[in-house]
């Protein structure tokens, strides 16, 4: 029995392959344009990016290295030298490290005494205020309110106006007497301090790379640091500096700083390239003048007699040294190298995008390049004629199969007496035509 013709028109649905589009590989379409202006600009920008990435970011700035920007450090300082002063208040006095260095144990901040003003044997009592103090001069007692004390006063007013000397009358105060004169010596008393030497020992550690190094030469010679002086080329691992040279490198004059004091900053910077080993890590020293005036007061107390405390007041002028240690260490790493190269590749992509914008929107032939670069592909639509053509081909195939079966030899009786059945009706005529249909389904 032949299959019915009603099923002859079934067709494969386009949706039968739905889902396989996710596995398709899509590639870009490249259009070669003969526009020398945009082409030259693209090559110029690409060349600049390659030079920047390779020459500057990768090699000059060592973009292929991992960085440790937080070093751990320790500092030990020592000052060496002696000086002698001859003044009326103290007589002949020798000054050594314990006298002119504050604090004497050596830290990253210390003070070198270069000048001083001494007021010996002060005891608490009543005495005239110094005329240089604001509101200290007076004519009558009413000019000195009792209990009043000013910001710059040496004590508290007693309410009396007394004679200071032959030319001045000042308010009497309760204070450490006699009061400080306030007259600074005309020349530094410790002028020999410019020949003192400063030893700075610094050890830096980069824990990220488990690396540690000192700025002082490792030597068994105990006299090496007694004779050497720092020179960047000849003795970079001898951190011994002459004070006068150090102040000059900071941009100051020792005589000026020694008179009224000042502040000098010393920076020790480590820039270590650990790819070259220990030889690629050494310190750089720089000096900066921070202040041109610095002083403070200190006193030595004792008991002059039972119940009477006395002191010697020193107003110290000198140079304060602030030592700052900074540093960084670098070593080759795959991640920073990949990041640097990836950044360069991204910039090359930006150049291509920029040139596309010029070509498609700015160039005189932009409309032509637009039509060439972008194409619209539309899927063909199914029409009535194509559907009926499919049905006709399927019907003819089924008719041929039916005729082949009907022309087969007659069946013979079998042993059981049964025989093969013939088709129940004749095949359709070969000249039977499907009705034509125009228009869309």
Curated annotation (Swiss-Prot):
The lineage of its organism: Eukaryota, Metazoa, Chordata, Craniata, Vertebrata. Residues 429-441 have a biased composition (Polar residues). GO terms for cellular component: cell junction; cytoplasm; dendritic spine; endoplasmic reticulum membrane; glutamatergic synapse; neuronal cell body; nuclear inner membrane; parallel fiber to Purkinje cell synapse. It holds the Pfam family P2X_receptor. Monomer. Unlike, all of the other P2RX subunits, P2RX6 does not seem to form functional homotrimers. Forms heterotrimer with P2RX2; with characteristics clearly different from those of P2RX2 homomeric receptors. Forms heterotrimer with P2RX4; functional differences between homomeric P2RX4 and P2RX4/6 heterotrimer are minor. Forms a P2RX2/P2RX4/P2RX6 heterotrimer. Interacts with SF3A1; resulting in a reduction of the splicing activity. Belongs to the P2X receptor family. Glycans are attached at residues 165, 195, 210. Residues 61-333 are extracellular. This is P2X purinoceptor 6. Residues 410-424 have a biased composition (Low complexity).
């Amino acid at each position: 029995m032949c299959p019915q013709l009603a099923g002859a028109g079934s067709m494969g649905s386009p949706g039968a392959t739905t889902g396989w589009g996710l596995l398709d590989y899509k590639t870009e379409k490249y259009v070669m344009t003969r526009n020398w202006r945009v082409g030259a600009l693209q090559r110029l920008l690409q060349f600049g990016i390659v030079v920047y990435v390779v020459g500057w970011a990768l090699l000059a700035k060592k973009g292929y290295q991992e960085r440790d920007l937080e070093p751990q450090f320790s500092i030990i300082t020592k000052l060496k030298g002696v000086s002698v002063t001859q003044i009326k208040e103290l007589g002949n006095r020798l000054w050594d490290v314990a006298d002119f260095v504050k604090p004497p144990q050596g830290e990253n901040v210390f003070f070198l005494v270069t000048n001083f003003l001494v007021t010996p044997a002060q005891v608490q009592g009543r005495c005239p205020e110094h005329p240089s103090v604001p509101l200290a001069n007076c004519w009558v007692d009413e000019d000195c309110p009792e209990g009043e004390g000013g910001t710059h006063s040496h004590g508290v007013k007693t309410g009396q106006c007394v004679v200071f000397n032959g030319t001045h009358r000042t308010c009497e105060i309760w204070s450490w007497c006699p009061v400080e004169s306030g007259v600074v010596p005309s020349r530094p008393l410790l002028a020999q301090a410019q020949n003192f030497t400063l030893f700075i020992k610094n050890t830096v550690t980069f824990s990220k790379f488990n690396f540690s190094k000192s700025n002082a030469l490792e030597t068994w010679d105990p006299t090496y640091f007694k004779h050497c002086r720092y020179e960047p080329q000849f003795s970079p691992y001898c951190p011994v500096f002459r004070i006068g040279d150090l102040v000059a490198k900071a941009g100051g004059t020792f005589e000026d700083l020694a008179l009224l004091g000042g502040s000098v900053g010393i920076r020790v910077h480590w820039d270590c390239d650990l790819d070259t080993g220990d030889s690629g890590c050494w310190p750089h020293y720089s000096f900066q003048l921070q202040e041109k005036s610095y002083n403070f007061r200190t006193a030595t107390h004792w008991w002059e007699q039972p119940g009477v405390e006395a002191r010697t007041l020193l107003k110290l002028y000198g140079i304060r040294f602030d030592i700052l240690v900074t540093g960084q260490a670098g070593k080759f790493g795959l991640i920073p190298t990949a990041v640097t190269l990836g950044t360069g590749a991204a910039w090359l992509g930006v150049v291509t995008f920029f040139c596309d914008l010029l070509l498609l929107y700015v160039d005189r032939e932009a409309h032509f390049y637009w039509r060439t670069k972008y194409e619209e592909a539309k899927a063909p639509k199914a029409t009535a004629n194509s559907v009926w053509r499919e049905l006709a081909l399927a019907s003819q195939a089924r008719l041929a199969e039916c005729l082949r079966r009907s022309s087969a030899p007659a069946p013979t009786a079998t042993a059981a007496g049964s025989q093969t059945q013939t088709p129940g009706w004749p095949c359709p005529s070969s000249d039977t035509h499907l009705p034509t249909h125009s228009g869309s389904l």
